[in-house]
């Protein structure tokens, strides 16, 4: 991965960041242009973001082009609020379904991150909540509502005992799930989801056995870390959760390790 940033584009304080990341399953090119508001440039600003991503992972093949305009408020309380408008054009094959979908959808987001202790925080927490809404009335190819919530808590007791908990929720409401791009569908599995399972390998499947993606997601993790000496830590964890489209067909998966 490589990135380049120009912190001062002009006398108004605009800045530009570009990044490129390349791996076997994903190749991505992004840019972000920040426009501070003169009345409060440190806490209020616009972001214009765009990019292209190619994905070939498990049963997903996708080419995605995106453009977004967002308005941010960084509050003194530590909370960040944003409203955004996104456009995307996706050509994808997910399992046995191939489609091209154009989306134009607004959304809102609120988040906060706090930490103490440097690169290995001894205390901290992170919350992020978002809602996105698409409707064919203004040109999108599919109607949907998407709600997501991510939470992380870190606490340390008596210097040596560190506890990390994580929780993720997601819900998609739509009448045409096959037209929802894979990037918006839910998959579980991997280091930040359910360890012990391949990355994004948990979801409902098509009749041929290919992954379909889910409209509902819930995962949770509890990890205990012990400071053996200096910078050496030992850890044990339990992860559990599911990615399903019918909550009546629960299929919880659990991973544990040390």
Name each model feature, range by range.
Residues 162-237, 245:
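Extracytoplasmic gating/loop element in the C-terminal half of outer-membrane beta-barrel translocons
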Residues 30, 93-97, 141, 175-185, ...:
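Outer-membrane beta-barrel and related beta-rich outer-membrane complex signature
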Residues 20, 131-133, 240:
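Short glycine-centered, acidic/aromatic-flanked micro-motifs in structured strand/loop junctions
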Residues 70, 105-109, 128-130, 148-150, ...:
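One-face residue pattern on beta-strands with alternating periodicity enriched for small/polar residues
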Residues 50, 127-135, 142-175:
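Transmembrane beta-barrel strand/turn architecture of Gram-negative outer membrane proteins
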Residues 248-258:
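C-terminal beta-signal and terminal closure region of outer-membrane beta-barrel proteins
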Residues 1-128, 155, 163, 192-196, ...:
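Gram-negative/organellar outer-membrane beta-barrel architecture
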Residues 53, 90, 134-136, 241-243:
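A short, flexible beta-alpha/helix-coil linker loop
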């Amino acid at each position: 991965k490589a990135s380049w940033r120009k912190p001062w584009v002009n006398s108004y304080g605009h800045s530009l960041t570009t990044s490129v990341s390349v791996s076997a399953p994903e190749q991505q090119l992004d840019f972000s242009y920040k426009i501070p508001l003169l009345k409060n440039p440190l806490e209020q600003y616009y972001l214009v973001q765009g990019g292209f991503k190619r994905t070939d992972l498990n049963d997903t093949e996708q080419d995605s082009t995106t453009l977004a305009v967002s308005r941010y408020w960084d509050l003194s309380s530590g909370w960040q609020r944003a409203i955004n408008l996104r456009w995307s054009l996706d050509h994808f094959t997910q399992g046995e379904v191939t489609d091209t979908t154009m989306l134009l959808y607004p959304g809102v987001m609120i988040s906060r991150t706090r930490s103490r202790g440097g690169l290995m925080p001894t205390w901290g927490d992170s919350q992020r909540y978002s809602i996105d809404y698409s409707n064919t009335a203004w040109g999108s190819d599919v109607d949907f509502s998407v709600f997501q919530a991510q939470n992380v808590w870190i606490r340390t007791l008596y210097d040596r005992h560190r506890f990390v908990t994580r929780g993720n929720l997601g819900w998609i409401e739509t009448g045409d799930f096959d037209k929802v791009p894979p990037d918006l569908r839910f998959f579980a599995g991997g280091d930040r989801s359910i360890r012990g399972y391949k990355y994004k390998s948990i979801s409902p499947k098509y009749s041929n056995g290919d992954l379909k993606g889910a409209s509902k997601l819930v995962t949770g993790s509890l990890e205990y870390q012990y400071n053996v000496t200096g910078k050496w830590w030992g850890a044990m964890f339990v992860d559990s959760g599911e990615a399903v489209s019918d909550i009546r067909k629960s299929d919880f998966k659990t991973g544990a390790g040390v």
